[in-house]
Structures are given as C-alpha cells and as structure tokens.
Amino acid sequence: MIQQIDAPLREDVRLLGNLLGETLKQHAGQDLFNQIEQIRALAKGARDGQAETEKKLEQLFLDLKDEEILPLTRAFSYFLNFANIAEQYHVVRSRRRSEFDEQGPPPNPLIHLFEKFKQNQISSKQLFQQVSNLSIELVLTAHPTEVSRRTLIQKYDDINEGLSKLDQQKLTPRERQQVLDDLKQLICSAWQTDEIRQNKPTPLDEAKWGFTTIEQTLWNAVPKFVRELDTLVHQHCDAHLPLDISPIRFASWMGGDRDGNPNVTHNVTQEVLWLSRWQAADLYLRDIEDLRWELSIQACSEELSQTLGRRHPEPYREYLRSTRERLKATRQWLSLRLQGLDGDDSQIIRHKQELLDPLLLCHRSLMECNLPEIANGKLLDFIYRVNCFGIELLKLDIRQESGRHRQAISAITEYLGLGNFESWTEQARQNFLIQELQSKRPLLPKYLNEPEGSLIEHPDVKEVFATMRTLAEQPPESLGAYIISMAEYASDVLAVLLLQKEAGILQPLRVVPLFETLKDLDGAAKTMETLFNMHWYKQHIQGKHEVMIGYSDSAKDAGFMSANWAQYRAQEELTAVAKSHGVQLTLFHGRGGSISRGGAPTQQALFSQPPGSISGAIRVTEQGEMIRFKFGLEGVALQNLEIYTAATLEATLLPPPVPKQEWRDLMHQMTDISVRVYRETVRENPHFVQYLRTVTPELELQMLPLGSRPAKRKVSGGIESLRAIPWVFAWTQIRLMLPAWLGTGAAINQVIDENKKAVLDEMLAEWPYFQTLIDMLEMVLSKSDANIALYYESHLTDNEDLKILGEMLRQRLNDAVQTLLSMKGESKLLSKNDVLDQAMQVRKPYLLPLHLLQAELMKRRRLYTAQSNAERTPVDHALMVSIAGIAAGLRNTG
C-alpha cells in the first residue's frame, strides 16, 4: 500500500521510525516496544478493514493503567512528527532532484509561468513593470494551532539537517555512521523532552518565535529568491530589476493583535516593537562584519572617495565603519530600553534609508570600478534584506475589535457633554467624526480629573488611549496596518482615525476594516462606498485602500460553502467599488491552515479569487502551524516565496474567466441550501452544543497551553462565544471535520437531483474558483472518518438524544462523500491525488491508536473531575500529548 510513495521518502520514514524504536527499547524498555509493535500491527489490520483487530485494540486500551498510557501516546505522537519531518525534507530533496532533470518540469513555478506569459503575448515591458511593482506581504500570526514546543522544533530542524547530510553522495562510511549517531542522539533527546509546554506562551514568546523564523530561514531565503527572480527577468525582459526591489515583505500580529486577548497591552506592544528592532540591528551587525571582511578592495569611485574626505587603502571598510557603529549604538539603546533604562539615542538608526544609502553608494562605486562580481555578492544580499526587512524586521499590525473604539469615542463624547456616541444614528456618528477629523484642536485636555465611575476612566478605554499614545512614539516604518475586527460601519473606520489624531500620531497607520460575518461581508462594498463618497476621506487615503476578508468567523457563522461564496462576492463587489472611485485596492486575506479558515494550496487559492481582485498586490496571513510547514526549512521557504509570486503574477496578468450568470445562479441556490442546513443543525438543534462539548475534546482543548489568547471570547454561552479556531480544532480531533462539509454536501446533492449536473460539470471544468472549492472539500473529506467519530461518541455518552444527533451527522458525512464522488464520477476520494492519499494511508496505523487512547483519556478525565472537582488529573499530560499528536498527524489543526 505504501509502495507508491517515493522510495527515498519511504526510507527516511522507516529510518526515523527504527531509530525511535531503538530509543524506546533503550530508555522505556523492551516491554513497551513490544506493546507498541503489537498496537501498530493491529492498527494496520484495522486500516485494511479487519473489524476484529479494532475490537482487540479497544480492549487492550481499556485494560491499561493510567500511567501506562502516557508512553504509548508519546510514542505514536513522535512517529507522526517524524513522518512530517521526512515529508518536509522530501520537498527540498525533490526540488534538488528536479534541478538535475533537464527533461522534467522546472522546480521553480516562475520558469513555466514566464513561458506561459510569452505564449499569451504578454510583452516583456508589461512583465517587467508588473514584477517591479509587485507588493506581496505575508503576515505571521500566532494563532493557537502550533502545538509543538519551540525546543522540539529546533531538534526537528536538526533532524532535517541530518536527513540532508545522508543524501550527500560522497559520505565516507565513518561520516555516514556519525550522521546516524547524531540522528539517534537527537531522537533520544526529543524522547527525553516534555513535548507539552508547562505554561501558555506570552505574546512576547510568540513574537520571538516569529523572529526565529526570520533568522533561521527567511534571512537567507529572501535574497536567494530575489536573485532567482532577477535572473529570470533578465532572461525574459533583457533588464535587471531595480536595486530597491522588494516583491515580498513580512509583517506580524504577534504582540499587536489585542482582539479578544487581554494579555496584549500597550506595554507588551512596546516591548515587542523594541525587541523586533533589536533583532534586526543584531542580524545586520553580523552581516556588516561579514561584508567589511569581504570589502578589502582599494579601487573606489570619486563619489566614495569624496564622501570619505580622504584617500584610504581600504575605503569600503573605512566608509562602513560608521554604519557599523550606528548599528551597535542602535542595538545598545534598544537593549537598555528593554531593561527599562534610558540611553543615548543620538546615533541610532531610525529609518531604513539611513542603512541603505551607504550600501547603495558602495554598490555604485564597485560597479563603476568594473567589479560587478563583488558588487553583486554579499553586498547585494544585504541590500535585498534591508529592502525586505527594514529596520524593524517585521512590521507590526495592530488589531482591535470595533466595539472597543466605539466605547472609547463614547467616553470622549460623554466627557464633552454630548451624550453617548454609541446610541447615535450612523449618520450622526459620521458627521461628528468627520467634523472632528477636520478640526485643528484636540478633543481632550492633557490631564483628566474625572470621578472613578465615569466611562473615560474605564480600564478598557484607558488601554485604547494608551495603545494609541504608544503608537505615536514609534518610527512609522515599524508599524503596519491598524485592523478593525468585526467592522460593520463607515464610522468604525473614522473612529480609529480620530483616536490616532487625538494621540498625536503624525503619520497615521492605514486603517483596515475586517469584514468577517456573513452579514458584514454582504455589506462590505456598501460600507466602503460610503467612505469613498466622503470628500475628506477620499483625500486622506490618496488613492489607496486595504480591506481584510475574514475566513474563520464567516465559516463558523454560515458553514464553509456559504462563507466561501460570500467572500468571493464581497471581493468582486469591493473590487468594482474601488475601481469606480479610482482607488487601488489591496485585499488582505485572513486565511488559516484548515479549509474552513480559507486554507488551500497557495497557487490554487490565489488563482481562484475573482478576476481583477488581485492586481499585483495582496496581503495574506500565515497562521500558527502553517508558518513552520511553509517557512521552517530554507528550501521549503524558497519554494513558497516562488509560489506566492507566481500565483500573484498569474492572477494579475492572466486572470481567471468571469463566471457565467448560470454558474452564479447555481452558487446562490447551493449556498442558500447550505446555510439553511448548517444553521438548522448548529444553531437550532437543542442538543448540538451539548454534543460538541461531550463528544469532542472542546473543553479539554482549553487545558492545552497553545496560544496567549483565551479559547473563548466569553466564559459562558453557546457556539457564538467559541473562537473559530478551537471550534475547527475540536471537530478535527474526532475526525468528523464538520465545519468543512456540513450543508455543502446537501446543497450539491439537491442540485444534482434537480438535473443540474451538466452545469456543475461545466463549473468544475472551467471555473478555478469552483475547482478549488471542490478540491478542498475532497481533501478534508479524505481526512474524515465516521467510524472514529462513532468510537468517541459510544465511549463518551449514553445520552439517546446525543446518539440520534451523532447518527444524523455521520449519515450526512457519508452522504457528502457519496455526493462528491458521484459529481466527479469517481469511485474513491483522492483518486487523482496519490501523494496526499498515500500520506494519509501511512499515518493511519499511528493515528488510530491515538484516537482510541484519546477517547479513553477523555472518559477517565471526566470521571476524575466529576468525583473530585480537581482542575488537574493524572491523565492530563497523556491527553494533551494525544491532542498534539493528532494535530501533527492530520497536518491541519484549526
């Protein structure tokens, strides 16, 4: 069954599995090893359809003592993590292999795409202009689905490095044995490490994790990528890219996203901003030391000589000395600030240009002296890095919920004796905000002396004001966008602009409304039209605007298909409104790893957006565990930078067709059915919330120290109070995957029954948007397993009402699978995606025991808490390991 998987990948999986086995024998005993082998054999039998083997497994787990479960869950969890490592390294290996194969397809998708542009009569001038103006920004967010500890991630990276060494042809037997010994030592060290964090990460921990990704992979991958791009452009357009090119940049929400996270305060934001600049200065200092070592050349231009003011035997080294000293001063000053101390800031670097100008002068001089090899060596890499990472490493976005801003403005209006802003009509709010934005005077005195109970003294209001004052003190280059979550009205955007003005922010952050519920997505274009019609606002934005489309909350609100179509329509309408007002629109996609959070292969996801909606500019969130999968290894990071660039260029220069009216009508019909079925189940079934809390580990997930934010917006309440990410995570753990297919299968089935299969076939053949939607549905259905979901249910509840609901949900899951197969005319899922199918087949013998163990652990934990009311129980650790292991095995968590 595993034969179709690439032999080298199979060998790596086997090697890591064997080394883990040896470690277990040595450190956990032969008995445990034998037990694991027995369980693995039974699980393989169960995978291949032998019903009696699953029964044996169940009995075996029932008989285990509490303390016997932890080593088992750890062993299976580690195997799944090692399979991921092998797969991730295999991407790098395959890429290298394809570079040797001149007959095969090129590893870089841009090579094929540039040929396609030529065939489609895209002129070299048009292509050059488009590449030069590309603006892709990837925004790293710490969504709480990265369940692996950073300590272990480092060991996993070292294991990757070991696999890479084993691939080298010229290792001597002794060298090869040394690599194997190193791998064994790493696996032994991982086994002896607790894979579960003891404490939730702080927002500062999350931010440091983002900086680590930059330092370890992107710092080298970015200049390599820009060089590749420049070579390609030169081949096809006979011109080199401008030196200030930066097609891809990075931003972050870690330490800036305060929506629903009381742990992100203005002090935390300040600390993260300083730390980010410190990290950048530190990395540039290493680079400049390297560069000064290389630039021992005597020959220099008249311009450089005059700037130095004298002749010098090593002009470049001498000239860059002051830049090095300024970087040291910057790092030292930031170090002091992080310790709460003041220091001399007269020499610090405050703007990117202060770092770039000396580098560009050196480059001009070397080119003038006919030394392009040196000019375009380490120096050019340095220039590309400064273009991409600036003085801040990652621009920090700020995100806050619209209600907090309304509350803050209400505090101001109440203080001024104007009443409560929140109770005014929308028109009255807009009038007040525009009037005050045009006024030269401040609204509030510098010092307030109000009684304690007044709104202006409310801690939440004071925190909003304090955050704005903190932003006013930063170099503008350190900051990205100010995002308003749950944006509904034009006044939501104006309110943030007024709060920025009141705090004295001289270069206001661009304000980005985030539309995320079905209702807000449907009203998004109208809201933006209202803003664009305001003379003051139109002048303020200077022809550019950014709007964020939310994926998670809309899918939780309406189901995958309805949310997906609402997002598509909102983008179409926003693109049209912006165009009619002459505004250049950038859409910011709040995607995640799972499909109900917009997760899809990048190229497919971007090409399936509405035509015209990606016009050379895009922002996308990279969330939680996806950061590690996409950027954790330099080779994989490089590939993902190429894919983003190719996808953005293709969607811009060769956009997909405008969907036919017949297709749109059918999508409307299907989404109406889909949202009705979804909400009938999720919102109207009186037993649904109880089912979620009983059968899935939704409540137990809150124990896992995942991200720095609470799993719920409010402590009590139903589905509405649950964050979108734990919502997806919980259903994924029991393999029901409900958010992704509920309602969608029923909708497709109904239109097939109405003899509209021919239209569906046409949509599938000709419309990239619909192809992606169906591919994503198929991928998630292939990871679902009704039998595993039934096992959790039968193990965890005797309630007849819940069993009836569970039966209905599993039936609907099976119906969705059958509907998809009949629509595609295929007999099994993933019949055209062998790689994913095989990856799941390999994982099944390791996932099944973890699921059965998890159900048993949940049962035991609930018994303990019912008996003693204790917060901690003897099975907590094993339960958390099972949650992390299943997340690793399925590769998309929340």
Curated annotation (Swiss-Prot):
Question: Which reaction equation describes what this protein catalyses?
Answer: oxaloacetate + phosphate = phosphoenolpyruvate + hydrogencarbonate
Enzyme Commission number(s)? 4.1.1.31
Q: Which residues form the active site?
A: H143, K556
Q: Which UniProt keywords apply?
A: Carbon dioxide fixation, Lyase, Magnesium
Cofactor(s) recorded in Swiss-Prot or TrEMBL: Mg(2+)
Q: Top-level EC class, please?
A: lyase
Mind listing the GO biological process terms from this record?
carbon fixation; oxaloacetate metabolic process; tricarboxylic acid cycle
Family matches, as InterPro entries: PEP_COase (IPR021135), PEP_COase_bac/pln-type (IPR022805), PEP_COase_Lys_AS (IPR018129), PEPCASE_His_AS (IPR033129), Pyrv/PenolPyrv_kinase-like_dom (IPR015813)
The positions making up the signal sequence are: none
Q: Which GO terms describe its molecular function?
A: magnesium ion binding; phosphoenolpyruvate carboxylase activity
Q: Which GO terms describe its cellular component?
A: cytosol
Q: Does the keyword Lyase apply?
A: yes
Q: What does this protein do?
A: Forms oxaloacetate, a four-carbon dicarboxylic acid source for the tricarboxylic acid cycle.
Family listed: Belongs to the PEPCase type 1 family.
Q: In its UniProt entry, what is this protein called?
A: Phosphoenolpyruvate carboxylase
This chain is encoded by the gene named ppc
